[in-house]
Each structure stands twice: as C-alpha cells, then as structure tokens.
C-alpha cells in the first residue's frame, strides 16, 4: 500500500518552494543547527525526504538499505558547511520518504525517482557519495543526467552486473524464497532489531540509532522496503535488476573524474 507522509508548511530554496517536514524529536536530536528537512515529490504521492545543510558546492550523499539520509550525520559534522551544500535524500520506502507496495521496488524506479530529485533541485554539478544500494541507485540516477557528476566518493558498494549465478550473502539467498523472506525479515524479528549484527562494529548501531532508522518505517504501517530491496539485489544474468545494472556498469566504466574509494574492511557483507 502507498503511504504518503505529510509535511507542514513550506521551505524556500534558491530554486523554489518545497514541502517542509519538521523532524520528530527522536530524529531532530541527531542533526546540527542549520539543517533543512523537506520533501521532493517525484511523482504523485511519492515523496523523497531530503536533509540538507550548508551552502556552496553540492555534495549528493545517498545511503543504502535499510537506513536513511541520517546515515551521513557524522560525516557531515566533519565537513565545511560554509563551502559545501550537503544533500542527503532518503530512498523511497525508507525513513520518512513515502512507502510503496513491494512490487514497485525496482532498480529502474529508484533510479528515476532519485534523478527527479536532482532535476527538481536544479543541480548543475555535484560530487556524489554512495554506500550499499545508494551506490548503483545514485550512479543510475546520475546516468540519466550525466553532465552533473564532477567527482565521487564510493563506500562499500558495487556497480558490476552479474555474469553468473551467485548470491551476495547467505541471508540474501534465503530471503529470496517467498514466505521465508517475510518470516525472516518482517515477522519473527524486525530487520532494524538485527541491524547491529551486520556491522563490523556492532556498537555503531545502538538501540537509539536503530530506532532512528526503523521507527518511521515501522510506524508507517508499510515496512516492505527492506525485504524488497534485498530481493532487488541481482543474483545472476536473468535477475530483474540486471538490465539496469548493465547500464550503470557501462556508465561507471566510462567515467573520467576524481574518485576516492573508502572501504570498511570489517563489513561482513
């Protein structure tokens, strides 16, 4: 089912007005002064929640599954907000963005929706930072507006389309099975309750941070995104995501830009 979040009032950016979204207290405590919180409606009823802070050269930071734009909150604290405009959207289905039926979670849809954010913010150039699903979705969105990308910081992610049958992890293999996946991720326990277990440092996701990511999803009544996005991960040449991954791979291979790869060596996935 489609769950449409509701904001309050408007927020004015240089490129126009957007629907403001005052953060609830449990989320507001994680952001520094000067943050903007607003929605970009990428198609009727589908709103992408955006956190933004700073002014200057745009940096587009995209998270993965099952977190949100808040993933980059500590990164932002280390960056010069007087010289950088830091834009942190949340993927549709997660955080405070709209929730959608599981069937609408496709790589092509997420690419198109995130590209719409770039277009509506009227960005003309940017540096991109991506992690997990934010890697291919972000690069896929940029492949639709290839003139924008001037540099990239790549975290734990990947852009290669699979050429043979293989699963990313044992968990990804298990959740592909209908009903089994639902029982594992949605019924027996919430994916957010286990989030600390798939970190190199489990202490990096204490209970309050798990709540930051999980509460807006669970309270929405539609928590289909985490499982749907796990099933989006291509496991072979015939997977529904593979065609889009081939486009993304080709785009990334042709890039000639400054890039930095920062990889968490204890990432268990």
Sequence positions of predicted segments:
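Flexible "cap/lid" subdomain of the alpha/beta-hydrolase fold that forms the substrate-access gate
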Residues: 8-37, 48, 58, 71, ...
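Short hydrophobic segments within beta-strands
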Residues: 3, 53, 61-65, 129, ...
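Extracellular beta-strand ligand-recognition surfaces/modules
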Residues: 1-8
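Conserved HGGG/HGGXW glycine-rich cap/lid loop of the alpha/beta-hydrolase fold
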Residues: 46-96
């Amino acid at each position: 089912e489609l769950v449409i979040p509701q904001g309050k009032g408007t927020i004015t950016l240089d490129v126009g007005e957007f629907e403001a979204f005052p953060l609830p207290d449990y989320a507001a405590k994680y952001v520094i002064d000067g943050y903007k919180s607003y929605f970009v409606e990428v198609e009727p009823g589908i709103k992408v929640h955006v956190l933004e802070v700073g002014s200057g050269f745009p940096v587009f930071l995209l998270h993965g599954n099952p977190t949100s734009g808040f993933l980059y909150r500590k990164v932002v604290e280390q960056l010069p907000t007087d010289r950088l405009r830091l834009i942190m959207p949340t993927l549709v289905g997660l955080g405070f963005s709209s929730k959608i039926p599981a069937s609408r979670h496709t790589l092509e849809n997420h690419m198109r929706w995130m590209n719409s954010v770039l277009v509506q913010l009227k960005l003309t150039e940017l540096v991109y930072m991506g992690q997990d699903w934010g890697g291919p979705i972000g690069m896929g969105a940029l492949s639709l507006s290839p003139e924008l990308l001037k540099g990239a910081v790549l975290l734990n992610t990947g852009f290669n389309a699979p050429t043979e049958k293989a699963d990313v992890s044992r968990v990804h293999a298990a959740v592909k099975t209908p009903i089994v996946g639902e029982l594992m991720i949605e019924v027996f326990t919430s994916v957010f309750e286990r989030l600390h277990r798939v970190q190199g440092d489990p202490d990096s996701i204490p209970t309050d941070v798990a709540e930051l990511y999980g509460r807006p999803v669970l309270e929405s009544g539609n928590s289909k995104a985490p499982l749907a996005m796990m099933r989006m991960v291509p496991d072979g040449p015939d997977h529904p995501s593979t065609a889009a991954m081939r486009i993304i791979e080709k785009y990334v291979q042709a890039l000639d830009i400054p890039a930095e790869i920062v990889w968490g060596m204890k990432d268990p996935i």
